[in-house]
């Protein structure tokens, strides 16, 4: 019988498992196949950051003269004495070390520490444990600088050889590295792989390659297997080949692997394991399209069994509480729905299956999966990695979580659209939502319309306001350099972002420079967006980014530097009063955005306060307590006494009891009918009263 070993190669992420192998394992195990999985990414990082390996690194010669590296070398004994303790702390094994780490004298400090200034300032932003994680992360980054200089330039904590894989016209470009002798990191990587092969004895090994930064490591592992286990068949798939290698004509990669899978890997791997007809798979003989797809429901619950949960490291690369979610915390990564429910943005790879094909499952099914993953991992923290989670499904999932009394925390990606009302955001927060990330992109209504984003600044502002008021942190993905964007619009976009930070709508953000890709609407038809391709050449190996020509009239590099510098200050809470044009080098126009643009949008009424007889009313608070002159409503941290007329009290007791049954829909039309049993007054007038407003944050919601 075939046995499959699924491998996450170095380096993807170190704080929690990347979910690809877990989803594949879950599906294939339910189909009766023998499947094991391994995360070489986290296992190798633990080996690299160990006393044994660092002793070997410090024995290597530092090339040239570098004052910072020489300082690290001079503190060799401090690094080798502390490294194992630091890794144990970051794995959560020895939290008591936090106080010692924060003294400022325990860890050796080199160049990465220079930007933080006085360590005592950190305690105004972070608690002791978080401060210690932040300092340990700087410490590992200093060591990474040494490793890059002495062992291999390809090393970074969460990527390996990324620049090699970013634009490979032919496979020979990366093979020039593969024919070189292995460096010490690659040797350790293959030693870890050897242990997995010996323990599991697979007949097939599958590598997930989600990003360019793990292609080289995956190929090194495959090379090792071909040399030492030529009978093992090797498959590779994931985001990188599905995006960049779809039109591949260069067959050089098949000297290292046997199958290259595109898009979702469940069915292709099932066919390989069962010796069936290949689907969406390259072999050295050519491409096999085949037929069939696995639905999101059939894909089912991921299975994280077998992954080394005690070895993941929580890192803090920034003091910003929202920005650090990507590297801090052991999140169970899951996908609510397959694809994007919008799938129309001009910059997005909307022609690819993982975006284009939208499928979902009922909320109850998804929450069943969540409970199963909790049993597997012991963790109640989730990151839903959807391209954009659907608001309607988030509402139903939140209701199901509350109905079951499930205690979880979660964050996800969204579109900042009008359906995120104030009450929906309160519902999501009550169900454990702590943060959302979404695209504000160019922050220009003209360009948002041109890129078919489907939202405008006004909608985004209201959605962000509602998330923020509900206590949900907000991260904004930002973009510059979109075709036809002027220098004035670049300045104005920064002003919009400044006002949003000033208003407390955004907790963190990141600027991306627009890249035209072959799978996006803008890459398919550049002329429709006011630019033209530089050439129509198709590479034999990887094809993704499209070079284009535009009469821009300004230095896009300087614009990017200004935007990044401003954002760095905004996320630290300063620079918000500085005129935005002053962040840019050279002659730059002042903003043309009205100084009160965002403030004016924030005072617009929320859709949750517009009476809709078809809307659902829910009560998610504890049972109210009747008093002589009204009700006492208990929140998590306080209680509020509200005075009502006797008939209002009786109505609300009945309403809240009925609306607390989250298994059935109770509408405002039904609530109005119920009100007529207690009063001849207008229900709408009562609904629009200050009394009703006071009950909303305590759990009386319109969704």
Description of each model-found segment:
Residues 2-12, 20, 40-42, 49, ...:
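A structural motif corresponding to the C-terminal lobe/cap of the Radical SAM core domain
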């Amino acid at each position: 019988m075939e046995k499959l070993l699924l491998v996450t190669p170095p380096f993807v992420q170190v704080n929690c498992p990347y979910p690809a192998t877990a989803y594949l394992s879950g599906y294939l195990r339910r189909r009766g196949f023998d499947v094991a999985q391994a995360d070489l990414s986290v296992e190798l990082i633990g080996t690299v950051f160990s006393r044994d390996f660092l002793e070997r690194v410090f024995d290597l010669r530092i090339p040239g003269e570098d004052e910072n590296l020489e300082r690290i070398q001079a503190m060799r004994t401090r690094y080798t004495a502390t490294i194992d303790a630091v890794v144990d702390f970051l794995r959560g094994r020895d939290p008591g070390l936090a106080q010692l780490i924060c003294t400022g004298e325990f860890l050796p400090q080199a160049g990465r520490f220079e930007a933080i200034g006085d360590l005592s300032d950190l305690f105004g932003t972070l608690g002791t444990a978080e401060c210690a994680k932040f300092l340990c992360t700087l410490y590992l980054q200093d060591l990474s600088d040494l490793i890059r200089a002495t062992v291999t330039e390809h090393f970074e904590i969460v990527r390996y050889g990324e620049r090699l894989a970013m634009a490979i016209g032919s496979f020979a470009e990366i093979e020039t590295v593969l024919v070189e002798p292995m460096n010490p990191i690659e040797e350790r990587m293959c030693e870890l792989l050897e242990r997995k092969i010996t323990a599991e004895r697979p007949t097939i090994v599958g590598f997930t390659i989600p990003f360019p930064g793990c292609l080289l490591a995956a190929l090194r592992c495959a090379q090792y297997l071909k040399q030492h286990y030529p009978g093992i068949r090797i498959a590779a798939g994931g985001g990188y080949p599905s995006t960049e290698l779809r039109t591949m004509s260069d067959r050089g990669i098949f000297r290292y692997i046997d199958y290259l899978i595109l898009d979702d890997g469940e069915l292709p791997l099932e066919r390989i394991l069962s010796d069936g007809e290949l689907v969406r798979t390259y072999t050295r003989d050519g491409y096999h399209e085949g037929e069939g797809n696995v639905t999101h429901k059939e894909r089912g619950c991921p299975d994280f069994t077998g992954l080394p949960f005690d070895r993941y490291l929580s890192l803090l690369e920034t003091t910003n509480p929202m920005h650090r979610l990507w590297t801090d915390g052991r999140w169970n990564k899951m996908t609510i729905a397959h694809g994007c429910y919008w799938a129309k943005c001009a910059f997005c790879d909307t022609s690819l299956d993982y975006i284009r094909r939208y499928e979902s499952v009922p909320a109850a099914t998804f929450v069943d999966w969540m409970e199963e993953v909790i049993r597997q991992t012991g963790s109640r923290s989730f990151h839903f990695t959807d391209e954009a989670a659907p608001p309607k499904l988030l509402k139903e999932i939140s209701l199901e979580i509350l109905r079951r009394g499930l205690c979880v925390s979660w964050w996800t990606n969204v579109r900042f659209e009008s359906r995120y009302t104030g009450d929906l955001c309160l519902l999501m927060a009550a169900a454990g939502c702590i943060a959302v990330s979404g695209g504000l992109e160019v922050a220009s209504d003209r360009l948002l319309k041109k890129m078919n984003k489907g939202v405008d600044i006004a909608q985004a502002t209201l959605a962000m306001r509602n998330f923020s008021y509900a206590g949900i942190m907000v991260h904004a993905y930002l973009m510059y350099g979109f075709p036809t964007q002027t220098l004035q619009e670049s300045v104005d976009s920064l002003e919009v972002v400044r006002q949003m930070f000033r208003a407390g709508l955004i907790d963190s953000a990141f600027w991306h420079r627009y890249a035209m890709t072959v799978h996006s609407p803008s890459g398919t038809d550049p002329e429709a967006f006011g630019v033209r391709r530089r050439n129509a050449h198709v590479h034999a190996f990887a094809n993704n980014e499209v070079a284009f020509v535009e009469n821009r009239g300004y230095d896009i590099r300087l614009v990017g530097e200004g935007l990044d510098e401003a954002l760095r200050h905004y996320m630290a809470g300063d620079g918000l009063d500085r005129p935005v044009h002053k962040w840019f080098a050279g002659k730059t126009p002042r903003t043309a955005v009205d100084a009160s643009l965002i403030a004016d949008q924030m005072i617009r009424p929320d859709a949750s306060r517009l009476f809709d007889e078809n809307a659902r009313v829910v009560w998610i608070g504890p049972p109210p307590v009747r008093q002589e002159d009204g009700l006492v409503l208990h929140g998590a941290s306080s209680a509020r006494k509200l005075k009502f007329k006797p008939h209002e009290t009786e109505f609300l007791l009945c309403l809240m009891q009925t609306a607390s049954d989250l298994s059935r829909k109770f509408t405002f039309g039904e609530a109005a009918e119920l009100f007529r049993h207690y009063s001849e007054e207008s229900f709408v007038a009562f609904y629009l009263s200050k009394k009703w407003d006071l009950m909303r944050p305590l759990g009386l919601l319109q969704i």
